[in-house]
Amino acid sequence: MQIVDKSFQNFDKFLEISNEEGAFALINKPKTWTSFNVVNKLRYATKVKKVGHAGTLDPLAEGLVLVAFGKKATKEINNLILLKKRYLAQFKLGATTKSYDSEFEEENIKDTSAVNLKIIQELIANNFIGEISQMPPDFS
């Protein structure tokens, strides 16, 4: 099985590898697309029958989706999902929305001028380290 990087220029060779050995590619999912949209578009564009992804990103999130091409690669997806992941997030302080994301208009707007990096780091260290159980919002 092969992992190709952005320097890999031979698309026909990629398709050959996908069908014979299986291959993985990191795809930058745009905002509003679902991970399933990415898979469907790639399946259609490449004509590879077996295409799958190793984890769902929220439609409002932008980010990398690991996409498996070919039967051998898609069989490995369940093993990959169990691996540890790291996330990088951007957030805005001082407002809420009905959906807890950018889908609805901001409300309850507060002044955040007194907030600094030290305060944020302390809040994270005291509240968001280790295993966390959360209740999903009504809009999810």
Predicted regions and their residues:
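Catalytic/RNA-binding core of pseudouridine synthases
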Residues: 1-140
